[in-house]
Amino acid sequence: MKTTTSDPSTLDILTFWDVLQNLLIPIWPQDRTVVNGQALGDAWPLSTLKTQSKDDNSDESTYIQPFHKLTQWLAYSLTVPFTRILSLEWKNMSSMTALPEYRNGGLFVDLGVLSLKPASQDRGLKATSDGSGLPSFAAGDDVIVEWRAMTLVLVDKLYKLVLQRMQGVELSMAQLLEAGTWKAGREVAKEKRPKTKSSPIVILSDGTVF
């Protein structure tokens, strides 16, 4: 990892991100979204991007919503030893996003901020086979991709609201996620579904997304 030329005690998260992506993209399953022969990992087509677009673009890659949740989680985690042990600082951390996963997203569903459309709810319930009574969808289903995208937007808005109440006390996005939305999502899920503590929407995944 190279430090910035202007300050040898500062690392650039954008450079670190490039390193992680170059290392990890090749290991993701090849049945995922592919552009120019390259599997993209945790990035999925989203029909909303196409229907809301004002451009008549035939390039389907334009309508892909990237998440890379596991890689971002890893990146957040790996910044900690550089800071705490080596006393180095990171720049461009604001380029990182929230983590679009089922605890953060489940919080907004359980609290009534987001809800499935009736047709999607019915389709999800028909796909459920575990007796949970919860709607289930594949990780690449448009419902899940849109839910995760909305999770990013809502956590960003929540982060700004929380910062306004911090009275100048520094709070990173990673701290909000770990001690705030993720923990709250788990606690609310435990209260609403004590037997399973599962998300209100079940994601059918092979473990390479969540």
Question: Can you say where each PLM-predicted feature lies in the sequence?
Answer:
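C-terminal structural cap/anchor segments
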Residues: G124-T128
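Extended, well-ordered protein cores
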Residues: M1-I85, K91-S120, P135-F210
